């Protein structure tokens, strides 16, 4: 039963947590949203500098909230890939320093594996095998979860990730950053059937469409053309209806692919991870479809959908219990397929 101090700095949240297997003792998140809103997206250098300023206060607060000290910690973990290089380096450098100082083993964690483990934190009885729909700002993936560190990629996006599409469409609608929660909020008072938008489908060379891969560039372009047409006609933007129609199309597309994949692979359980997992339309459509097909579907609580260190600690605890440790020589990586997770361990 390992107690892990974990650090997550892969993008624009400085996060520190203390977890014991699947129990959260503390989960501190310092968001940088306000800093990046001015730029309409994450600025890597700004993110790195802010991580440097907030990492120590977050570490202190994590111990205070958990009411623990260093003698209670068995291992130290940090996200090592994928992510922004400068941002990752802040968290990993802090974790390695603490590992040496307090003589604790270091566990490097794959960010996407962390999102998978967010479901374990809210569903203690969840066990592989299951299908994970991982939808975030940088990824849209259908992952066959076979065991700790053992994954098969069944579907992915060919262009924009779902979260990225939300941000881009939000800009088209003259909304702020981050786009996901703002579009969701606007959609609550909009008509999801006001506009017919194309679902993202990926053509195969031999004909037909890939059953599990996604594409959101065409959907984004369709919204752009609608906006341009309305502006040319000097009409006001029906922002709420556009937001609802866009969100409905994304949710419907992801639901179809996820259910098809689960049925094709005889997987009876679906877990959802990533920030887009907080989207109300996706939760509604996927829950309804799963019930119709006698499948179980698990969504983490909203606070565990977005980046946090508790999910990193949960993944690290599982690796710790299996004797998987990372050398201090390990570096950070901007990209690393989740199928190569075990390369992080000796």
Curated annotation (Swiss-Prot):
Q: What is its main location?
A: cytoplasm
Cofactor binding mode and count: Binds 1 Fe(2+) ion per subunit.
The record ties this protein, via Gene3D superfamilies, to:
3.30.420.40
Q: Which residues participate in substrate binding? A: 134-138, 167, 180, 184, 279
Q: Give me the disulphide-bonded residues.
A: none
Q: Name one Pfam family in it.
A: TsaD
UniProt-listed GO biological process terms? tRNA threonylcarbamoyladenosine modification
What PROSITE patterns does the annotation carry?
GLYCOPROTEASE
Name the UniProt key words of this record, in alphabetical order.
Answer: Acyltransferase, Cytoplasm, Iron, Metal-binding, Transferase, tRNA processing
- Cellular compartment(s): Cytoplasm
Q: Could you give one GO CC term from the UniProt record?
A: cytoplasm
Q: Does the record bear Hydrolase in its keywords? A: no
Enzyme Commission number(s) of this protein: 2.3.1.234
Q: Where are the transmembrane segments?
A: none
Catalyzed chemical reaction(s) = L-threonylcarbamoyladenylate + adenosine(37) in tRNA = N(6)-L-threonylcarbamoyladenosine(37) in tRNA + AMP + H(+)
What are the binding positions for Fe cation in this chain? 111, 115, 307
Function noted in UniProt: Required for the formation of a threonylcarbamoyl group on adenosine at position 37 (t(6)A37) in tRNAs that read codons beginning with adenine. Is involved in the transfer of the threonylcarbamoyl moiety of threonylcarbamoyl-AMP (TC-AMP) to the N6 group of A37, together with TsaE and TsaB. TsaD likely plays a direct catalytic role in this reaction.
Q: Family per UniProt?
A: Belongs to the KAE1 / TsaD family.
Name under which the protein is recorded: tRNA N6-adenosine threonylcarbamoyltransferase
Q: Which organism is it from?
A: Gloeothece citriformis (strain PCC 7424)
